[in-house]
């Protein structure tokens, strides 16, 4: 018998997102390694128990891009948390079925290194390739159920973006 999940009874997974910009204000976009179709996104991930959001952001950046904290400069933090809900076809299939979506705190960092220093082939690899893109292209490239979050994040950090 198939179990029906009521998303309203599930919490949001606490997460962080990182808008990483280069010197020109272009955004780091990674192609998800687990997607057979184009699915570009910015680095993001869960906040571990006892971890502060900013610590989680720097850890996730390292895990997903190989970029250490010393190679980025903090620029801004979004004032509010943003949420998204998983679409019905993913509900119960990701994160052990424990969450209805994510509640994210977003950070903007400027990358101080070179493209050659980016290393997406980490122990926690999430991207198969990466590139620098403009804000509108980033919003257009994200999966539809996360698009409203990306629109809000881009609007928040607009003065710093190309």
UniProtKB/Swiss-Prot annotation:
EC numbers on record: 3.6.1.-
Xref: Pfam families: NUDIX (PF00293)
Domain Nudix hydrolase: 11-155
Family matches, as SUPFAM superfamilies: Nudix
Keyword Hydrolase among record annotations: yes
Top-rank taxon: Bacteria
Cofactor: a divalent metal cation
Gene Ontology BP annotations: nucleoside phosphate metabolic process; ribose phosphate metabolic process
Gene3D superfamilies according to UniProt: Nucleoside Triphosphate Pyrophosphohydrolase
InterPro entries (alphabetical): Nudix_hydrolase, NUDIX_hydrolase-like_dom_sf, NUDIX_hydrolase_CS, NUDIX_hydrolase_dom, RppH
Residue runs in coiled coils: none
UniProt keyword tRNA-binding, yes or no: no
Positions of short motif Nudix box: 45-66
MF GO annotations: bis(5'-adenosyl)-pentaphosphatase activity; guanosine-3',5'-bis(diphosphate) 3'-diphosphatase activity
CDD domains: NUDIX_Ap4A_hydrolase_plant_like
Keywords noted in UniProt: Hydrolase
Cited function: Accelerates the degradation of transcripts by removing pyrophosphate from the 5'-end of triphosphorylated RNA, leading to a more labile monophosphorylated state that can stimulate subsequent ribonuclease cleavage.
Sequence similarity: Belongs to the Nudix hydrolase family. RppH subfamily.
Protein name: RNA pyrophosphohydrolase
